[in-house]
Amino acid sequence: MVALKKVAEILKNQLKCEETNLRFWTILTFAAGILACFFTGQTARMIVATSTCIVLLLAVIFHILNRNTKILIVFLVAFLCGFLSAAWKIYTTPDEPTKYGAREAIFDAKVRDIRLTSGDTILTLSAINPPILSLKNGLLKLKYSGNPMEFSVGSTVKIKTSIRTVSYGVFLGDKSYENYARFFGIIARGNIKELEVVDSTSQSFTDNFRKHLQSRIYEATNRSRGAGVIIAILTGNNSFIPQEQLDNIRHSGCAHILAISGLHMSVIVSFVFMIFIHIFSLFPSIALRYNTKKFAAIPAIAVCLIYLQIANVPISAFRSFIMVTLGFLALFLNRARTTMNVLFFTFLSMLVLSPERILSPSFQMSFMAVFGFISAYNSRLVNNVNWHPIKSRTVRYVGGILASSIIATLSTVFFEIYHFKQYAWIGLISNIPVIPLTEFVVLPISFVGMLCNGTALGDLLYCVADFFACIICQITDYTANLHNAYLLAPQMQTWQLGIIIAGLVAVFLARSWVIKIGGMIIAVCGLISYINSPKPVLVYNQNLKNVVFLEGGKYYSVEPIKSDYLHKIWAQNLGVREILPMSDSKVLSCQRARDRIIGCEYKIADNVYSIKYSNKKKPVAVYFNGGRFVERKD
């Protein structure tokens, strides 16, 4: 009994350490409520909402009876608020449209968004009087291979397209894209075959400047491959980077340099902030009477806002802009600036405005990376390290970059595996030269060139930046082509990701070593569950058009997967580089009727796996073992 009392006392003291983090845990509980609503069915939502309300009512009653349940009430209210905000988003989102195959259609549409890539242009459109009535209930995301410069956001276009509704994943059990697409209003995808501009609205000054900037950089550098990197860093448009080069940048673990995120924004803001501080210091009448930092913050925020508009307001840059603004606001008000407070307030404000953003990979990875950096910086492990004995600046620099890469990798690797089914470990090495070249050479020089855009000095600065950008391309080309530079990972289940991230959040945020150890155990359990997940033996889509089976550690396709995109997605989800065509020697046999697969049978050891149609013409997986059939519907 004495030992138990001591343990209870230790736990009580440890939990008291979390009182200073109560606001952070409350915000995370709000986010948990959003996720609980998005990833449960209609019946489960009613059960969760009712149970939460009952527990909240009981907690209030106990609190009235002088029982200390204040913290429990706060958490329940936060969870319920997050749950209800997500429920409202679901309620106001159109229901899933009727499923149909690819259809040819001609109709007018209004351009809502344009995203340029190294291949096709991705257009987000809203249909105007379409022949398929359900298309009026949401947005269309279509690929266009023509010239995107002839129209802009707000233009009305007439398109001829092959279109299909967004389906529940192109891979068995993978519903992540449809969950993301539905709450962002995307109900159909397809390809534009013909496009005619009906009404071209006048482009804004920002759009015109962005297009002129891109063409000027491209021509000033003689269309060098480094020009694409410069354009991506300044405008967020990676369409000027060749596809092979873009793949190498991703496989080398350096794709983050192309995303306008907090690192880019902080370099630009710090650059402008320091310049204006030195300018104001030249005037003693100002420097001696006023706080020049407050004056310098005004142009820094203005430049940050301009950079955000030129970059077309990506999520990661928007998050960084809010954090920068809040930091300078604290400077104006003479308040202490705590980075964790700023991060969580930004996190909460973005979720309150758009709870569906929590489903965005960019949102998840951006916040988790910054969260990891701040937590590591605030930890005793970092603060207690004595760096002074290390006299070599090179060693300290390499160690700092390597430590930053490890922290960023640990924070985001599981999101990378979940969304992209791969992990570029080589990034731990390639980032050592790439990050300083990008942030302290290419970005500042390019930014000054942008300020002098249209002049000979601007063109000269673009050429200088292009020289170093080409060095970055050479580094990424070399590291990406090393043996096993990036590793493919099989599909991770949503619940496995949730367990791992919950454990990491506890490790990063908690002050109590008890909660830290508990979070570490939870994260390890989730990781072990993922590693030990059995490989699927038989995989198929809803109409049995594509059937893939496992034999000898390799996957074989019954019929060739005609779509390169579909082949890539299936291979990624299965964690392999390719799916091989089935040869005549394989043991999988398929029954056919009028050249259509109606069932397949695969023998492995004493078991027989088979796929066939049910009475309702829907595919059913049947597993046979010891003479007993067990149906498992897809």
Task: Please provide the spans of the model-predicted regions.
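Divalent metal-coordination and catalytic microenvironments
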Residues: 33, 109, 161, 233, ...
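Non-globular, low-confidence helical/coil segments that flank catalytic cores
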Residues: 108, 131, 146-160, 180, ...
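Hydrophobic alpha-helical segments of integral membrane proteins
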Residues: 7-18, 205-220, 229, 237, ...
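N-terminal leader/targeting segments
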Residues: 1-98, 102, 508-509, 629-630
